[in-house]
Amino acid sequence: MTVTAVNVLISLGVAALAVAVWKAIVMVIQIATSPLRNIPGPPNSNWVYGNLKEIFATENSVLHEGWVAKYGNTIKYKGWLSRNRLFTVDTRALNYILSHSNEYQKPALARYNLGEVLGEGLLIVEGEQHRQQRRIMNPAFGPAQIRELTEIFVEKAQKLCLFWRNEISKSGEPARIDVLNGLSKMTLDVIGLAGFNYEFDSLNIDGKPNELNQAFSVMFRSLEGFAIVFPLLKALIPPLRLIPDGRSRRIAKARKVMRRMGMELITKKKAEILRAAAGEKEKDNLQSRDLLTLLIKANLATDLPESHRLSDEDVLAQVPTFLVAGHETTSNATAWCLYALTQAPEVQQKLREELWSIPTENPSMDELNELPYLEAVVRETMRVHAPVPSTIRVAMTDDVIPLDTPFVDVHGQVQDSIRVKKGDPIFIPILVINRSKALWGEDAFEFKPERWESVPDAVQHIPGVWANQMSFLGGPRACIGYRFSLIEMKALIFALVRAFEFELAVPPEEIMKKSTAVQRPLVRSEMDKGCQLPLLIKPYHTV
């Protein structure tokens, strides 16, 4: 190592130490002065991890639900370095937080870690930049556009059926199949075609991984896991970001591939759109209706003010955003739906009978939406098994959050609002709200599609963008692609439940949920195999 390199490392070390000391002082002051310290909650378990290790050691929402039962609707617990975090299931408070997206934003730590992988896409940016991107992207996710994409959903769902039939032919009936694997391949293929007209061809039995597929696999894996120390330190202490590590190198290499191929796609699509605008006839087919093409068309509109246009970099950042947001969530939601159907065979059969009442294998979006029991099954799956169980916001300014239900603070005083200081983190408990007995009744933990025939009045206050639940959040940062996800999920369930009968391949107690950004199934006795959902599958034969 040269003298210059040593000097650079020493300088970085000194800078990192100075930043760390400064941040530690600021954090100590914040902990000591935060109004959250007066809110009741569980005792601190560890100075470094706070209560986070307890949370990650249990299934999503289980520990939180226990805390609510013991300490009430509004509590605090400890996060990284014992910092206070607000936790509330008060629907008025949550509505206030979600509707004031400028005042309550994603934490810098989460934005850095996600941004390192995804770039400055819609999931990451805040404020005016978010509004600008969303304004351009909204039309691409409207009902008319999703209606045009339904053909892709149905086609890929049928291809997954062929994929599993091939597995069954090899091993006999019923075949033990990891359904999560096939569903992940299918949703990746869908978002490739529907997102930017790119064929990943993951469901091709004889296919080989392509360059872009491999790059995104690296990016997906980098988002998994808990307590990766150096990436966490880099997020907290910016000078450390200048020191390369193995994870950063892998991400940089994958992003280089994504950038090169993404810019090729964008350049090609822009040229096609401009040629069409110049008078050449554009083909009216699905290939010209993918989300990226619609985004570029909207961005090139002649009536769009120049200040509202996105740069090519902003457009490029949406490619990995489409993939991450539209791939993992839908595949895991559908996997949990199939799991729920194995635990309620009468529901599975009732659903199958409704699906067979449609005299086509290629339903339209409207036909899928006209199936009431399918709608109820999807709603109940998203309620009980929300793919994203929680999220975090941070107060960007001192504020007072209103409450429906007052709480008693640690000094015995009744409080009808929550005071927060700038920098205070707030946990948004998506799954806890979805499974709240106070809102949904004593059977809230149970999978019962029939509950959607008449829902309790209390759930009308849940601040969700869809179906009186929090699964797609609410407010200005509600999931922009919820219609896309729901129709894709319906197309999958339609094809799969018509084609196959499903049973769980292991005892129910063997299945657990991994606590990560997305809820993934695991088998307790096969943890070394990673996330999986093994089901016994056999073809369904109509009588």
Swiss-Prot record:
GO terms for molecular function: heme binding; iron ion binding; monooxygenase activity; oxidoreductase activity, acting on paired donors, with incorporation or reduction of molecular oxygen. Pathway: Secondary metabolite biosynthesis. It holds the Pfam family p450. Its main location: membrane. Heme binds at C479. Glycans are attached at N332, N434. It is an enzyme of class 1 (oxidoreductase). SUPFAM superfamilies: Cytochrome P450. Keywords: Glycoprotein, Heme, Iron, Membrane, Metal-binding, Monooxygenase, Oxidoreductase, Transmembrane, Transmembrane helix. Its cofactor is heme. InterPro entries: Cyt_P450, Cyt_P450_E_grp-IV, Cyt_P450_sf, Cytochrome_P450_monoxygenase. Its EC number is 1.-.-.-. It is found in: Membrane. Disulfide bonds: none annotated. It comes from the Eukaryota. The chain crosses the membrane at residues 9-29. It is a single-pass membrane protein. One of its GO terms (cellular component) is membrane. CDD domains: CYP_FUM15-like. Cytochrome P450 monooxygenase that is able to use carbazole and phenanthrene as substrates for oxidation. Belongs to the cytochrome P450 family. PANTHER family: CYTOCHROME P450, CYTOCHROME P450 12A4, MITOCHONDRIAL-RELATED. This is Cytochrome P450 monooxygenase 205. It comes from Postia placenta (strain ATCC 44394 / Madison 698-R). The gene is CYP205.
